[in-house]
Amino acid sequence: MSSLIKLRRQPKADEKPKASLRILLISPSYAPSRNTMYFPIGLSYVAAYVRKFGYEVVPLNMNHWDAEERYQQLERVLREERIDVVGITGITIAFNEIERIIQFVRPRSQAQIVLGGGITSCESELVLSTLKPDYMVVSEGELIFLNLLQTMESGGDPGDVRGIWYFKDGKPCSTGEGDGIGNLDDLPQPDLDLFGMEEHLAIQCEQQFSYHESHLVGSKMIPITASRSCPFRCTFCYHAGMGKYRRHSIVATVEHIKACIEKFGVRYFMIYDELFSANKARLIEFCDLVKDLSIRWYCQLRVDQMDQLLLHRMKAAGCHYISYGFESGSDTVLESMQKKITAAQIAKAVKMTREARIGIQANFLFGDIVETEQTLQETLAFQQANELFFVDWSAVIPYPGTQLFDRAIERNQIPDRDLFIRSMGNVSNYLWKHMINLTDLPDARFRELYVELRELNDQNHRKVRTIVEAGEALGPTRSTMTFRCPTCDHVDTGAVIPYPPECTQGGAPNLKSPIGIPGMNVVCPDCMRKHHLVAKAIPHVGQIYAEFQRSLDALKASQKEVVVLPAVDRFYGVVFEDLDLSGLKVAAVLDTREHRIGASFLGQTTIKLDQTSAAQQVGRAAIVLPWVEYDTAVATLLAAGFAREDIVCWNEYFAAAMLGDDAAQERKPGHEPRVGFGAPLPETFSPSKAWARTEPNKALVRSS
């Protein structure tokens, strides 16, 4: 076990400590575009600490740029700045991105590369051997990184620095566990300015809207931490390298909040802690100290510590959202996960939190080691009984460092650890292509249940639909709407709704997605409950639906045989509710995905899409339903001899509507998007024309 020590005396401001090393600290991004969901607080603490000892820090927060510009910025820094040490932080899912950064830096700089963060604390030898930094800091960075810098500067032996991995005689070597920090209040406040908090706040408006959670009133939000690690040890959770659970004092936390208010003018705070407080007294103290600051805040808590008076006190002090760890509604699964809570406690916390008009964020996890069809049914019944329609389903992931990872290793389910960790670099890709079944359910049934649960998320959302009262398309990517919360009757008038959400600040729609299918979960600003705005109910999106449906209806009327792609599984329910596919003369179904080959869809057995199978369908019309791989499918059809006018492609309708005909054709050389079977794009559908007012969607308007 590492020891917790009191921090050494920090130099006073007038002592002007000198240090020769110049350090580039890099925070990788976990998203392809600019990312405001993450701010490098940990690296901000490290930077603030080493700067106190005279080291000059050059920051690079890659979250502020899209994928390509990040590396342009990195190249610029390496070219223009004198850099002696490159520090990189990250967690396991950043493995591939960190590898790319290291490989980018090596030929451009002689600087020593130091890797830190959660990624170094599990499978340390593999990470060092594969990514090949010069050093790895394991556990908390402030003390260990400072000791390493001072040793590098003095020419000392790195083997004397506890808490690192490095190469000794060409072989990975560990120096054992380093010291942890005894009193977090001894640390200087994190250097938020250095890593671009102003920029972080400026781009938050780009992500005000999302499919998962959309807020009609944008709020700039500052993330803070009040503790480190967690006193609990759930089987699926990763704490390696975090050490013992420790907390800043509430007084110090509130002083940090006050400093942020003064500096940035922001009054909304997200408390990043895995567990903000393990006892009520600490929560009460916090509420008492912030109640007059006129702030709003979000935190993560346990259901077993809540009571009604405490929740009302939190609400009065500005708490507007709580993230709870539900995970399951089955006591059997909760016990296996070592959650140390019961389903009854979850239900009670839900009722009390709603009574206090505080929003709830939580998830259900499928796939614990004791999960069975019976335990799954218990959780499904629990979800419905408590109307947890926005507590979405995902799957248990055996992250390195968790008990579940160890179990997967024991069962020989991870034959290649390197490949497994790399697969987690894209969590969505992992869940759909590489997911490990830790249960005793057959693999085919396990996957089938997972797909059904993801579909259930959509169905559940639609049980609490936005009550649309009026709407008007403002252009190709936005509409103005008036709607009512179905829970509390709060009315929002004139809300401007961007769709898809990535177009919030004029961004381009992501056509390589099931665009137009997912709706948006809107948070009511009054009761803090979510309601679901169906995509088809948004005026400018509804127009595209109408045009696509006219194309389908034209095919029905012509009685021409059609081939359909793909055999939809994800979003199956939404597609069949919002589009009328009945009456089509379906002759074949094609798909590229192995797990769908042989599946029954629209009365046909799905066959594999390739040049040969596509050529066999020439002479029929092709309907390409919402699909991430739509462009590959269309290219295969064209290469096989399909006439362009015989292809009706959902994603290309959105390209035509949102980007215009010219832009759509630019994106797809040789493709002429059509609306209506065999007919060119009608003038009334052009985004360059006036967008017509639409009537309320009668199906979504609640009867009086």
Map each language-model feature to its residues.
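Radical SAM [4Fe-4S] cluster-binding motif and immediate context
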Residues: 191-360, 494-505, 511, 518-522
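C-terminal accessory regions of radical SAM enzymes
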Residues: 4-7, 15-17, 21-33, 163-168, ...
